[in-house]
């Protein structure tokens, strides 16, 4: 896990880390919504093909509106941004991917493995809402990460062999 600075002054440092990520969690303020820097990060995540989860933070602040933020995420970032607390979750997911639509039409449900595959292919961007400061619904985000992330398979030559000297 890497925690990169979100401030625009650290863009160069942050961009270097994106090249090695398996997944990203893009944190967006519910009070500020999608900002210019958010769009820049989104383009970079797309460029480096990084599957992305979204956590909309500060939902405990007065005047925040999850439906409004969700509509903004869909219009500004991607139609694949899906609120994973939605009552219509399967229907929304089915609209993001042909394999998900086929599975939903056949069984009326979707498996975690198929959802995880759509996330890994950047067809679906799971959105979770909460307050990091108050630990409100952070557990839901963690459960979502656990359920909807595919284990990455790396080639054997990715790892450095262990080399021992004469002393062991």
What are these language model-derived features?
Residues 1-168:
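Structural and coupling elements of P-loop NTPases
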């Amino acid at each position: 896990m890497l925690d990169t600075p979100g401030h625009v002054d650290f863009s160069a440092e942050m961009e270097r880390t994106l090249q090695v990520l398996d997944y990203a969690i893009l944190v967006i303020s519910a009070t500020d919504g999608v900002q210019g820097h958010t769009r820049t990060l989104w383009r970079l995540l797309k460029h480096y093909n990084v599957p992305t989860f979204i956590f909309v933070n500060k939902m405990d602040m007065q005047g925040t509106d999850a439906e409004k933020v969700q509509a903004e995420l869909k219009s500004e970032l991607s139609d694949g941004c899906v609120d994973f607390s939605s009552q219509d979750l399967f229907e929304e997911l089915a609209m993001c991917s042909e394999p998900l639509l086929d599975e939903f039409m056949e069984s009326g449900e979707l498996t975690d493995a198929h959802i995880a595959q759509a996330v890994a292919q950047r067809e679906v961007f799971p959105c979770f809402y909460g307050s990091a400061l108050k630990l409100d619904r952070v557990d839901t985000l963690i459960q979502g990460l656990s359920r909807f992330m595919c284990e990455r398979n790396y080639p054997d030559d990715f790892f450095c062999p262990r080399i021992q000297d004469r002393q062991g």
